[in-house]
Amino acid sequence: ENDRTLTFPRKSLEALAPDGFLGLMLPKEWGGLGQNHVMYAAVTETIARHGDASCAMCYVMHIGAVEALKLRATEYTIEKYLKKVKEGLIGTLSYSDPETGSHFWYPIASGARAVDGGYEVLKKASWTTSAGFADFYVLQTTSPDYNGDYSNLSVFVVDKDEIEAKPQEWDAMGLRGNQSGTLLLDWKFVPGEQLVGPIGDGANSNDEAVDPYFLIGSSGCWNGISLGAIDIAIRHTTVKKHKDVGMRVCDYPTIQDAVGEAIMDTNASRTFVFSVASALDKVTDGAQTNPAIGDLARGNYLHWLWQIKFNAAKNVAYVVDKMLHCCGGTGFKKEPLQLERYLRDGKAGWVMGPTNEVLRQFVGKTALLGMESLDYWNVSINERALNNELKKFSPDQKRELADRLIAEAGNNGASA
């Protein structure tokens, strides 16, 4: 129904609250379950497999927001937000930017300025899951003192009544219930207590909380969709008969091969996710401790976290496609199997930022050239490329370029 009517899965999310699942990894004294990263991956997988992938993705973003607050928890945020998630308070993350696409770490269109008692914050987001429906929003902007340094980021938490959202703009191929519409916080006042962590902490908290929880949770979601599609194919092919040859569809070796490969590939992806989640558990006491500001625990595993997302998103596209082949024309219809919904939902995995193209390059580039080669904020000079291009210049072109650079340097010095 959520898929057909573009309905936000509020009821499904609220159903998770009484048993503590909205605070899955929060301490029990805050109303949480005190669980770990492995359980988190299993929960998102289960919701996507047996329920609704839109709900699973909204849950992932909610957990990301909750854990970003927990990473830099204060008495204020504990009482106002974290202890209330058991009552059905739903959060989300808003990290995208209309100017930089899936490069969500580079918020060109956002900003903040310090004022008495807090900050005035501008946040423009091209995609925000649960936009207009979540109760609180953890968002990232450049810091008040960023001075052109886009690595100087800060994080704020704001309430629903402060933001402007346009959920009616969301009409996507899949994940149709998650309402990933645009969001605007138009230089609204945000009290100082709602700064999450210190000024300039955004890049560190992104690596330590936002990225790890998104990548673990979304990978679980894609694996859950794969498992759900396999479930559907097994149920259908074991009862569908071809009376002319006296065989069920599952009796054909080609169907057995396809299902077998799908199971093996999906279980390999699941094992990879649970393995990385277990590694995170070991360095955080089962998600119950966090490193000091400026240090990393989960963030040291980014290279592996990128890989699990790439693998799960790649696998789900292949698996659901093959299960559709196994189910034939019946699978192509919306009813009765609903396999086509799994196919559409699974397509989101590849394009959800960081996209698989970005992740593939990240992994390869860092393996070959080191993490510093990524240059997230486009500040490193590629001297090799620069010197190579200069060799192509004629003497006159070099003089022209030199004159221009000297003039620019003079202008910059005067303005400074």
Task: Please place each PLM-identified region on the residue numbering.
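A short core secondary-structure module
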Residues: 124-166
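Glycine-rich beta->alpha junctions and the first turn(s) of the following alpha-helix
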Residues: 171-267
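Glycine-rich phosphate/cofactor-binding loops in nucleotide/flavin-utilizing enzymes
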Residues: 327-416
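Generic structural signal for well-ordered, non-transmembrane alpha-helical segments
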Residues: 224-227, 260-267, 306, 310-317, ...
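Glycine-rich phosphate/pyrophosphate-binding beta-alpha loops
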Residues: 126-132, 214-218, 349-353
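Short segments within alpha-helical structural elements
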Residues: 318-325, 357
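C-terminal helix-coil-helix/basic helical segment that borders enzyme active sites and/or dimer interfaces
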Residues: 2-3, 267-311, 324-332
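Glycine-rich flavin
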Residues: 7-18, 22-129
